[in-house]
Amino acid sequence: MFHHHDITRDACMLRGPLAHQGYDWWWHSFTAQDAVTGEDKPFFIEFFVCNPALAEAEPVLGQLPANQAAGKKPSYLMVKAGTWGEDACQLHRFFAWKDVHLHGDAPYRIEASDCLASETALKGSVSISPGKAAAHPEWMCDAGEMSWDLTVDKQIAFNVGYGASKPLRDAEAFAMYWHAEGMKSAYSGTVTFNGRQYTVTPDRCYGYADKNWGRDFTTPWVWLSSNCLTSKKTRQQLRNSVFDIGGGRPKIYFVPLDRRLLGVFYYEGREYDFNFSKLHLMVKTTFSFDEHDEEVIWHVRQENIHAAMETEVHCLKKDMLLINYEAPDGSRRHNRLWNGGNGWGTVKLYDRQDGRLILTDEIEATHIGCEYGEYDHDEPYHEVTAK
């Protein structure tokens, strides 16, 4: 079963070698409503930490030319916050480790100044002037202001199983790990963005919360998820459902595997599991990403011995970000990492009966979180089958 909560996987993992070259982040995304117009607006908040063993008195920024010349790796807490839409932006606030209060064990809690993240709460603010954003390209961010005060209820989990278990974590077997403690999460509270007030409510937030950690990122980098779902069969909203797809090209003990995805659908209490690491399921996956002038499109087909899932997602480029990260070694190889929160599409679920796949439901999805990127040196990606 993948719907298995385990907050020990949300603990900070930067110990041993990962303290010297490693990152850990807690990601949160949700939809809010304009307090005046009621219009939906998606937001994200992330707490990203790296290389605590290399801490200095000030945040060490890996893209600063002086640090690159000195061979310094990044070391800091970065609070990343922003929005998607035609005014999409990402705002970064950096803290030196001496100014960070971290309870690394479960339940995790990380705090710096007025910024806080835990299993049940998010608070903070970021303010970047246009002049500062232009003068500091090493901040890798835009200009704007955002503050938030939220509670979090992580309702449905995606536990990837043995691949992120303690033995494989201790062995640092994978370059990048994933755990979604709240692939369906209920947020409540307020957000202020560039002077406008927004309200966040459990019924309309379509919230998500996960974390990644490791020594490097993946390429390609794929993520698709939504819990704003409507059955075409019944025309009813699926209020106890969520899908989540992620991965790319995992490395185990520095050896890259064929491009692979982890995918699940929690369908009104029933689990559809397409986790390639569960060998008994004999999962097969094909996926493609196509970039057009005005939109990007994902196609994913996953199949196991019991079922199949076909996912198609669209997102307008004008509503998306090219989201920025630097790796813990100081490199910045993801320079075209498309990231959005306004995706829409369909998911078809099939059950296998007497050797044939029978359509169980076709689901309309909106408010889809979506991501795709490849390292700069990779060949353009079209379609790969992973077995």
Functional labels for PLM-detected ranges:
Residues 1-387:
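Structured soluble/peripheral alpha/beta segments that form catalytic or ligand/cofactor-binding pockets
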